[in-house]
């Protein structure tokens, strides 16, 4: 009888472990793999930023805001110059992967200064960009786009007259 119980217990244990092993069978699934390769972007300046000729008052600070459409708005102690001057947006050509969107990075406020030969300076703030493709800068089906940059020139009360010049950086990258 003891042998029968031992044999019965062994059979029962083998059956239990067999059922347990079946409950833990391996499962397999698959995942997609891929990559998107993009062309390096290029940026080429085609025009410089120029606020044109400005008449400066003596007692008031002023601003000259150059829109991305190429028009100036004057406030405070400055008005449009009476001597001919050219108003231009900074303009750029961009190339890259066709139909890809990108972002334009412009200077932060109070980081760009223009200076005249006597050492007097002015700040340029509120840089804005507008792509030819609209609010979201996007390369065409040929992988090209253009954009213009506007900004605001801050003119101090009694600002020294002269020709002011400076530089600023613009960069582009894929979204």
Model-derived features: positions:
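N-terminal small/polar-rich segments of proteins
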Residues: 24-106, 139-175
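Sec/Tat signal peptide C-region and signal peptidase I cleavage site
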Residues: 17-24
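Cleavable N-terminal signal peptides
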Residues: 10-11, 21
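Short, low-complexity polar/charged micro-motifs in intrinsically disordered terminal tails
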Residues: 7, 19, 170-171
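Serine/threonine-rich, low-complexity intrinsically disordered segments
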Residues: 22, 128-130, 138
């Amino acid at each position: 009888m003891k042998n029968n119980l031992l044999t019965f217990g062994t059979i029962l244990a083998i059956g239990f472990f067999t059922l347990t092993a079946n409950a833990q069978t391996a499962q397999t699934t698959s995942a997609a793999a891929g990559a998107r390769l993009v062309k390096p972007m290029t940026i080429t300046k085609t025009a410089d930023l120029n606020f044109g000729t400005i008449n400066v008052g003596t007692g008031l600070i002023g601003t000259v805001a150059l829109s991305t459409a190429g028009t100036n708005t004057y406030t405070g102690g400055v008005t449009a110059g009476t001597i001919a001057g050219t108003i231009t947006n900074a303009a750029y050509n961009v190339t890259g992967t066709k139909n890809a969107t990108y972002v334009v990075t412009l200077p932060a406020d109070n980081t760009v200064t223009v200076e005249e030969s006597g050492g007097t300076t002015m700040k340029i703030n509120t840089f804005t960009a507008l792509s030819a493709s609209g609010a979201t800068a996007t390369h065409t089906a040929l992988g090209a786009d253009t954009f213009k940059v506007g900004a605001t020139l801050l003119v101090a009360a009694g600002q020294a007259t002269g020709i002011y010049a400076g530089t600023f950086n613009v960069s582009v990258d894929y979204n």
